[in-house]
């Protein structure tokens, strides 16, 4: 019996010990930015020395955005040092309603901001023939100005010190939601979603840096969305999103597939790669350099965060999925980074068995393995990475935004 026990003990001693297993660490925001209404941070851009945030505020005033609310919503942009010190901020608003959704930093250091806006409609006073009868001297309420739908693509150029350099506008026939702005040589590319009644289509539009817009190009007919994109050196882009439409004569494989688009420099749809699983709804929410993509898979009874690294369209290098309560945001730095709300075990983190869904941040290696892992105090709404600053994450607690830095 003793001999058998020693043999069993020897066998267990020879089992590989996960010496490199990741341990979940906690994080703390270096700054907190409070808000009162339904404010949003939509994008983050990093320079070697600063962190640029952009989004939309509905709060009447703010402790970290100068000025007061113009319409029902204003876009904004704010810059912080790598230590979280405020550098400058700018309200991108007027008496109309605006949103700001994406930023891109130009070679001269200026920042291009994409968003959308309304226009104010001033009613024309009714004309009357002669003197109207009004025996009771009733005071008539004047007709009030109203807003058009959110059908204007807004484009702002902001200096590296926070001054407005240019403002341009394109009027769309439909409600518009720009999701991503890219710089391609002398041009700007904006992609996102266009809404008409119950239908949503992806859109692509080019603008020169002097504000000349090309005709808008749309993809899909009823249920196609573009959520993000990256640019290629030849002027083409790779965009990601979802679609339940026929695209390039390829039918959807499920109700809604996650799709990756290759779009030429003139907006021609060249290639579509679909990701699908039977009886699911899928979407890609994010893409970063090196074809790192993040999204989610929705089943009838669960949701998974999906993270895939591709070598080319439809050619995955590695793929991981984790039980989740959200989609996945990704960023490419020295390694791959992903953030989502974890609701189950994560391979490579043996001790991670969350009792409640918890926002996490993962650093992934060349084969998709977990290198380091962190919990976040609130869900992430934006993530970015570069070699100088590291990885920056914006969290949203519902009452304030937090800035988390991993160096």
Residues covered by each model-derived region:
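Positively charged n-region of N-terminal signal peptides that target proteins for export
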Residues: 1-4
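Bacterial N-terminal signal peptides
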Residues: 7-15
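A sequence-level/structural motif corresponding to short, flexible coil/turn segments enriched
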Residues: 20-407
């Amino acid at each position: 019996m003793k001999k058998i026990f020693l043999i069993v003990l020897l066998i267990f001693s020879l089992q590989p010990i996960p010496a490199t297993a990741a341990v979940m660490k906690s994080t703390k925001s270096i700054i907190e930015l409070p808000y009162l209404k339904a404010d949003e941070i939509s994008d983050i851009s990093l320079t070697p020395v600063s962190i640029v945030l952009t989004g939309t505020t509905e709060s009447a005033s703010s402790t970290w955005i100068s000025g007061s609310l113009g319409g029902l919503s204003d876009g904004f942009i704010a810059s912080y040092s790598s230590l979280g010190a405020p550098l400058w901020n700018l309200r991108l608003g007027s008496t109309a309603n605006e949103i700001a959704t994406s930023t891109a930093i130009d070679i001269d250091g200026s920042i291009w901001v994409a968003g959308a806006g309304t226009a104010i409609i001033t009613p024309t006073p009714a004309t009357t023939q002669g003197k109207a009868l009004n025996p009771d001297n009733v005071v008539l309420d004047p007709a009030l100005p109203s807003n058009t739908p959110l059908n204007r693509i807004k484009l702002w150029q902001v200096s590296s010190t926070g001054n407005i350099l240019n403002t341009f506008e394109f009027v769309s026939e439909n409600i518009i939601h720009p999701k991503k702005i890219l710089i391609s040589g002398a041009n700007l590319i904006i992609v996102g979603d266009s809404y008409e009644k119950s239908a949503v289509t992806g859109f692509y539009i080019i603008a020169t840096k002097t504000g000349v817009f090309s005709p808008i190009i749309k993809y899909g007919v009823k249920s196609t969305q573009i959520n993000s994109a990256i640019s290629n050196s030849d002027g083409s882009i790779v965009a990601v999103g979802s679609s339940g439409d026929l695209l390039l004569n390829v039918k959807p494989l499920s109700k809604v597939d996650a799709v990756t688009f290759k779009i030429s420099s003139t907006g021609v749809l060249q290639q579509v790669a679909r990701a699908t699983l039977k009886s699911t709804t899928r979407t890609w929410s994010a893409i970063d350099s090196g074809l790192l993509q993040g999204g989610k898979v929705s089943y009838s009874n669960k949701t998974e965060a999906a993270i895939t690294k591709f070598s080319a369209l439809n050619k995955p290098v590695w793929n991981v999925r984790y039980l989740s309560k959200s989609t996945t945001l990704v960023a490419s730095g020295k390694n791959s980074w992903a953030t989502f709300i974890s609701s189950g075990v994560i391979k490579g983190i043996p001790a991670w068995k969350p009792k409640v869904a918890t926002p996490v941040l993962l650093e992934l290696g060349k084969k998709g393995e977990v290198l380091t892992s962190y919990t976040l105090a609130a869900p992430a709404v934006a993530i970015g990475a570069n070699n100088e600053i590291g990885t920056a994450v914006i969290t949203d607690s519902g009452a304030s935004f937090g800035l988390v830095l991993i160096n």
